[in-house]
Amino acid sequence: MIGDIIAQRYAQALFDLGKEQSLHEVELYDTALSQIEELLMTSNELTYFLHAPIFTIYEKQGVLLKLLELIDAAQPIKNFCLLLAEKERLPLLTQIINSFKVLLDNAKNIVHGQLITAITLDEKKQSELLISLEKQTNRKLELLFQVNPDILGGIVLHIGDKVFDASLRTQLECIRNTIKKGETNHAY
């Protein structure tokens, strides 16, 4: 919990620094951070090295600089990562990157979500549905399309912490509950 708050603060600081220049600069930061994240995900040894307290700050900074030069990271990203090493916040790097991406998505008015249907939709139907939902929400949506035959028909849309359930299964359950209530209200 505390780690999340700290990660959000570091992400906000980096985001604000980039935004002083332009949104394009923030996107460049995001590209570099994505490359760092990919390196961390593909190398358990690197992750261990950056997290392990047995290695000195200077050793970690040296390795970070070499990696950042390999991906041609901008100087502010280099400075940021060196600061994280100095403050011993490298174990929070993945959380910081995720928080940064959320800030960038908010700035670009992008919302991530999940759309569940009973059957597989072809690309044309997915595109039409996405355009329709974007018009209704006035936001750009990036949806993960999934199939769940248990919903019987219709859609279930998860956006952030909200769920919009327009599935046939839920509608049938509502009708069933209404009928049950009607039966219990008129029972002798």
Curated annotation (Swiss-Prot):
InterPro entries given in the database record: ATP_synth_OSCP/delta_N_sf, ATPase_OSCP/d_CS, ATPase_OSCP/dsu
Localization in the cell: Cell membrane
PROSITE patterns: ATPASE_DELTA
One Pfam family it belongs to: OSCP
GO cellular component: plasma membrane; proton-transporting ATP synthase complex
Gene3D superfamilies recorded: N-terminal domain of the delta subunit of the F1F0-ATP synthase
Membrane topology, record value: Peripheral membrane protein
Keyword Cytoplasm: no
Matches recorded under NCBIfam families: ATP_synt_delta
Subunit structure: F-type ATPases have 2 components, F(1) - the catalytic core - and F(0) - the membrane proton channel. F(1) has five subunits: alpha(3), beta(3), gamma(1), delta(1), epsilon(1). F(0) has three main subunits: a(1), b(2) and c(10-14). The alpha and beta chains form an alternating ring which encloses part of the gamma chain. F(1) is attached to F(0) by a central stalk formed by the gamma and epsilon chains, while a peripheral stalk is formed by the delta and b chains.
UniProt-recorded name of the protein: ATP synthase subunit delta
Organism: Lawsonia intracellularis (strain PHE/MN1-00)
Lineage of the organism: Bacteria, Pseudomonadati, Thermodesulfobacteriota, Desulfovibrionia, Desulfovibrionales
